Amino acid sequence: MTEYAWHKEIKGWGVATEISLGNRRADCQLRCGKRAEVQARPLPPDEVAGREAHADLWLLDCRAAHRSRRLMVWSDPQFGTLFRWERAWQGFAISKRPVFLNLELDLRTGHGTFLEVTGWTFDGYRATGTGQIHTAASLRSWMRYGLPLAGHQPVAL
């Protein structure tokens, strides 16, 4: 099976790929030393928990959900950036690591948008929550060069 183009692109933003950790591996390592899992499909809760034993954050491909309006993001003057994700990937309800949702990405130009989830709640197949928007360029610079994300607090381990 060939590697999915989105997966290959995103993990290439790190400083190293396919980081071996015992009998598991992380998709990429960031300049700051954190390890990221790059995921293009839903996972069951036990798989999410298992991968979190060796990964520090998640990058999820939510472009199709955003295009089809199953993942809606909007700005609220009182609460900031909010989102609702219909038919959300339920396995991630147990995630304890930071999550970034890829909303848009043009693989030819590198332009795109990510939502850093700052809090979420799952109710069946619906997830609602808060987040912070980042451009693909700023996320890539954070991953590869360690440049801080605008308004970003360091990801705790």
Predicted regions and their residues:
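Acidic-basic catalytic patches of nuclease active cores, encompassing PD-(D/E)XK
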Residues: 1-23, 30
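Short histidine-centered beta-strand/loop micro-motifs
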Residues: 18, 47, 116
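Short beta-strand-initiation
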Residues: 23-25, 96
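Conserved catalytic cores of phosphodiester-cleaving nucleases, focusing on short active-site segments
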Residues: 28-44, 55
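Hydrophobic beta-strand segments of well-ordered beta-sheets in folded domains
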Residues: 33-35, 56-61, 98-99
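Short, low-complexity, polar/charged sequence segments that are solvent-exposed and flexible
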Residues: 36, 54-57, 77-80
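Mg2+/Mn2+-dependent nuclease catalytic core
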Residues: 42-72
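Non-catalytic C-terminal interaction segments of nucleic acid-processing enzymes
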Residues: 63-157
